């Protein structure tokens, strides 16, 4: 029997305010130059006409004031045009990173975005490869997708789509935040204790179906505190309290119809307001209840077998009869 536990307490701290413009970047220990920036500087060195077209001044001629002397063994000026000189050329042209703008950021830390860019303020703008930055961003916990643009002369724009936390998943005594695709998010579960709690192996892959089902019955949904997936086939709901709340055992087939019937019965007989511990709807056409004084409840106990009660309605045309567990067979 799995034990449904309370989620960890939410830490008391203020949430970091969002910054959509990140003008100040931390100084990195290294500047990573991409082949594009190096290639453009190389072409500027070899072809002055092309340098004018792309907005780069060609390097000064060897021997002229301010020129660089190629290293020993270099065959021509192009081979002597190193990474450091490329960075200086780009800086002289004003193509340096001065500002980062971000849209779509809510849960992703600004420092993580700057770290993915990897070039400090004042570094060469052409040293930033948008595709490489996009890959780094999409590896962050909250980022589902990202788009990166270099905007001349001095700006990088980042547009991200974040993953939406859907539920807390408890498995083997541990908690994790999951999104609508059932993927775990590397986030502090204590910050999301108000999310629905799903329990059991395979629960993340079926959680979206459950929440869509509950959306159709908001009166039930607002009372659900936990849902346990049994055998990756059906759900058992805990209402009002995780520890000792009302247990509702849904059937494997057509749980939506079962919830509809439960709402109808509650409207007629105020069933959910009675002193019950279990409402069992696993058998078609039959609803079994257990009074709270009948003893503790195992929310994951399975029905070994059994047939619908004689004369039970077929096809869910009207609410099934209510049978107390002590009066009817619960095989």
Swiss-Prot record:
It comes from the Bacteria. Its main location: membrane. It comes from Rhodospirillum rubrum (strain ATCC 11170 / ATH 1.1.1 / DSM 467 / LMG 4362 / NCIMB 8255 / S1). Residues 95-163 form the POTRA domain. Belongs to the FtsQ/DivIB family. FtsQ subfamily. Keywords: Cell cycle, Cell division, Cell inner membrane, Cell membrane, Membrane, Transmembrane, Transmembrane helix. It is a single-pass type II membrane protein. It is found in: Cell inner membrane. Essential cell division protein. Disulfide bonds: none annotated. It holds the Pfam family FtsQ_DivIB_C. GO terms for biological process: cell septum assembly; FtsZ-dependent cytokinesis. Residues 304-317 have a biased composition (Low complexity). This is Cell division protein FtsQ.
């Amino acid at each position: 029997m799995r034990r449904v536990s309370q989620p960890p307490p939410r830490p008391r701290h203020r949430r970091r305010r969002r910054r959509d413009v990140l003008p100040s970047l931390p100084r990195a220990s290294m500047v990573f130059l991409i082949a594009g920036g190096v290639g453009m500087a190389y072409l500027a060195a070899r072809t002055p006409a092309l340098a004018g077209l792309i907005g780069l001044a060609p390097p000064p001629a060897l021997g002229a004031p301010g020129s660089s002397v190629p290293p020993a063994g270099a065959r021509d000026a192009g081979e002597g045009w190193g990474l450091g000189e490329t960075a200086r050329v780009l800086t002289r042209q004003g193509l340096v990173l001065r500002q980062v703008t971000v849209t779509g950021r809510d849960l992703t830390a600004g420092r993580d975005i700057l770290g993915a860019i990897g070039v400090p303020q004042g570094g060469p703008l052409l040293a930033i490869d948008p595709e490489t930055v996009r890959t780094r961003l999409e590896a962050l916990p909250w980022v589902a997708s990202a788009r990166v643009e270099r905007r001349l002369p001095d700006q990088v724009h980042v547009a991200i789509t974040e993953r939406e936390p859907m539920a807390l998943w408890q498995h083997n005594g541990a908690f994790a935040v999951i999104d609508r695709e059932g993927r775990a998010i590397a986030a502090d579960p204590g910050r999301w204790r108000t999310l629905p709690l799903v329990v059991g192996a395979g629960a993340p892959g079926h959680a979206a179906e459950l929440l869509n089902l509950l959306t159709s019955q908001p009166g039930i949904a607002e009372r659900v505190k936990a849902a346990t997936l049994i055998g990756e086939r059906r759900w058992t709901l805990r209402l009002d309290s995780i520890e000792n709340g009302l247990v509702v055992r849904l059937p494997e087939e057509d749980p939506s119809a079962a919830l509809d019937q439960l709402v109808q019965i509650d409207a007629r007989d105020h069933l959910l307001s009675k002193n019950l511990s279990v409402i069992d709807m696993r058998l078609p056409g039959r609803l079994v209840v257990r009074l709270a004084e009948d003893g503790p409840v195992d929310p994951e106990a399975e029905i070994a077998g059994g047939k619908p009660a004689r004369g039970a309605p077929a096809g869910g045309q009207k609410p099934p009869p209510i049978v107390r567990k002590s009066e009817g067979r619960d095989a």
